[in-house]
Amino acid sequence: MNNQAKYILKAVFCTLFFLTLFGTTSAAAPPHVAVFSQQGFPYYGPLEQTSPRSIAADLEAAGLHADLLNVEALADPARFNSKLYAALVLPYGNTYPQRAFANLKAFHQVGGCFALSGVPFTHGVEVNSAGVWNDLGHKTETALFGPGGIGVGGFISGPHGRVQIAAGDPLGLNSLKLDWGRSDAIQILDIASLRSIDRIIPVLTAGGQADAALVTHPNGAFPISVDVWTMTSGSTDSDDLTRAYGAEQLMARGVVAALAQKGLLTSAQKTYALHQMDKQPRPVAYNNLTLPTPPHPYSTLQPKMTLPARHLYVSDVRKLDRDMQRLLFCLQGLVNRKQPRVFLISDDNDSFWLETMQKQGHLDAPIPVADPLTLLQTFRDVYKGVVVPDPNIYVSPEVAVDIAAADDLLLATPELAVKLNLPIKNDLRGRFRDDADALRFIRTDLLPRLNPYLGAVLAPQILGAQLDDIIAAKGICFWVTGPADSKKPGVDMLAETAELEALLAQMPLGAIVRGYPWAGDGSGLGERPGVALFSRFGKILTASDYVANYSVMSGFPLTHLAQKPQPPAPKLDPSKVYLSLVLSDGDNLSLWRGAARPLFTDPLHGTFPVGYGMGPSLIDVAPPMLEWYFSHMAPTDEFICDVSGAGYVYPSSWGKALKDQTGARRRFYHDWTQDYMARTDMKGLRVMEATEDDLAWVGVDTPQVAFQMPDYGYLGEDYAHLTYALPGGQPVFRAASFGPEARDLADQVRTRVGKSRPAFMNVFVSFWGADMSKLKKALDLLGPEYVAVTPSQLNTLYRESSRQKADK
């Protein structure tokens, strides 16, 4: 019997048993519940792993009838009304479907119940002609009572302190044994926004206030409506799957409690329903994990190839279709595994770097290959055939990449294999049930034959030029879908995430994850959830979804490279504001392939000081690129280590799933980050998603780092909390801006420095949209009271000012 049949039988049994609790009359049938579910609908507040389908399954297991309804159904009074449904679950947080608002209001006014998440009914969303959901902006009155409101209540900032289960435990949460975290950043129901006749039943509390609650709303001649507010996001010490599970349980159990409060369930029926929910599967919680320690195949964090041949086979693949290109990138990886001999041109950036490597003396004249497909014959001895992915399993191409790396195969469609007369050695069509099954195969069957120190999170649609290095180093390619991918074949985001966690638990500390966990709004894990997940398991993301020819570039040895000397800092003037303009996103190695070059050839380059965040692992993966940028530095330029050290991690999440989190922190910062910063002559460090406590322990673990410049943009602190020194003396310059527009930058700096003089400011500038003319204009707008300096000069001036104050 398959799992689906077992689930159906189980649901039928639960429903029949539930009917015996109700009695046998048709009037006593289990209540029907609607769960809002719409592909691509934006989450605002809750984690994107919060699954409408899982909530519906929990309700079905509890004996209720649950239907997934989209926007079209919710907006139709004939398909959604209080006669058909007793309650509606709204799992997307602050966002709601504007088109359905009038019908939702009518449902609520006649006694329909809501299970709410986030700050409900504050962000209406509409779909445009292109099928993209657009947030219409914040609007408070739609949640309130009155002519234009739906009548659920407003919100206020939440209290501080641990979240605890309320007296009486009306949702039976104690049985879950979850850590509900702290409410420091949570907004809660504003009791003052309710009517005097409304009643609050606390579910979770913090600081004496209801953090989650049942709210009964008498409706005059109509039955009461009972809403459940479930705004808490759970403990940040827990992984996202556990937090999403907690949110789902709050909403599903809240529905049961609301229906019981409304009189649609008896006490016995409520008890039974909650007991059934207790028995539902829950995600594995990874804590106190000890990671494996297999032998490391190279001495660096990033994979390194051997020294390339002086004469490379060079071919332009731009005129080939994507399937042919992908096949040749696989061939390139297999050829270059032993010694880099093939360089493929997929855009103008590749031509630039090929010419640059010749000018640098790394390469001699290439061997031109007019027809790229002739490389298949030239290097026929390095591959054994092809592997064919399954078009009915979305992540099947990732599995095919891994098989290609393990078994010396090329990735091809069946049609391409026939066209090129290549034998199909592994056909994945029909091999897997779904994405999760495919990811499980990677972990159980392929991981032992691949390089556990290298992963690659790459969406199927972008697999291409970045594959050469992954295949050459036998990396592990994978992808986990997001809510926008829900209709793609084989997709199950929660099951996929669980499989990914199991895979990460079997990879060593410091394993690199190439690629990027986001491929458009709602596609993939998302940047923040993805980085947090990798960080929890001690894995280092290296953003590199659009790179190429690393299997060639990484082969050139480079142990250390010095930055150009800077002039001395200006004389300290106590009436001035000293600022350092520092561009963002340099941890993204794709940026250095092409997007950053115009900054260094701009006529304004070198006419004023600028700092650039850079991922120091560029010294491993592409030494010729690092050489080019360092050689094009002006004395007024400085590179600092970009987020958040030797790679992209969140200090607040780093190693949380591990038994020895302290050791993992020290390994990443004291050992790897300091080493890579020394190799690239970087003095300053930018970390991201870090509290003041995080910055303090990072400072302890990085005694050789001169200063910190944290944050991805301004986080709302005043000047006293923007610029300060850690107990060990290491200065911290938190971001005071975002930019990149000139007037915005100037206004942000003036506002946030206040009247402090002298002052020292980290002027964060978003790389995306920035250019030298905007930076120059911002400085002109600020005027002579504001002095631009390099990051290291800012550090020197701040330390001098601190000494002078201490001497007084």
Task: For the regions a language model picked out, list residue spans one by one.
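Active-site beta->alpha N-cap acidic-glycine motif
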Residues: A548-F630
